[in-house]
């Protein structure tokens, strides 16, 4: 049995993340041998978010492990605390942004289905991201750059 202890795990920061989105992350599924589920363990410093407001083609569950996190969602904002578990359904109803508005770090675990290709929509910036198996055809585009289904086919 493969396992990870989140109390001693050390997520890493991506130095390319811009200010406001600097959260440490550890992808946990590969560590424990997950194949059909995905998971991320995050440590979000004060004043930072883990990613922009978005919704996905996968269902996600958020468990706050320590601290408090403010969740922006389609109905407004809510502050979650350690022990709170919420579900973000696939599609627009599951849109969310997770921001630490406190003065102490927040630790959280996000678990989701792992359907590929994965699609995320970013309503604030009107972007759509697609992630494919092997990541060879990943793309991030603005909605206005879309083309007709039969473009260049006939």
Sequence positions of predicted segments:
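Glycine- and acidic-residue-biased ligand/ion/polar-headgroup-sensing regions
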Residues: 59, 63-70, 74-75
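Ligand-binding loop in jelly-roll beta-barrel domains
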Residues: 90-117
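Conserved short histidine dyad/triad with adjacent acidic residue
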Residues: 25, 40-56, 93
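A short, N-terminal "cap"/entry segment at the start of jelly-roll beta-barrel domains
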Residues: 1-36, 121-154
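Short acidic-glycine-tyrosine-enriched beta hairpin
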Residues: 74-91
């Amino acid at each position: 049995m493969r396992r990870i202890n989140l109390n001693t795990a050390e997520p890493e920061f991506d130095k390319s993340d811009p200010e406001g989105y600097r959260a440490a992350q550890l992808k946990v599924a590969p560590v424990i041998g997950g194949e059909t589920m995905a998971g991320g363990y995050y440590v979000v410093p004060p004043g930072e978010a883990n990613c922009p407001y978005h919704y996905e083609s996968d269902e996600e569950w958020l468990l706050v492990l320590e601290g408090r996190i403010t969740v922006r969602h389609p109905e407004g904002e809510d502050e979650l605390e350690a022990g709170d578990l919420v579900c973000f359904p696939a599609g627009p109803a599951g849109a969310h942004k997770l921001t630490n508005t406190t003065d102490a770090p927040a630790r959280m675990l996000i678990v989701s289905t792992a359907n590929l290709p994965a699609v995320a929509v970013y309503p604030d910036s009107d972007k759509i991201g697609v992630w494919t198996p092997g990541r060879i055809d990943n793309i991030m585009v603005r909605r206005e750059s879309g083309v007709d289904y039969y473009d260049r086919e006939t």
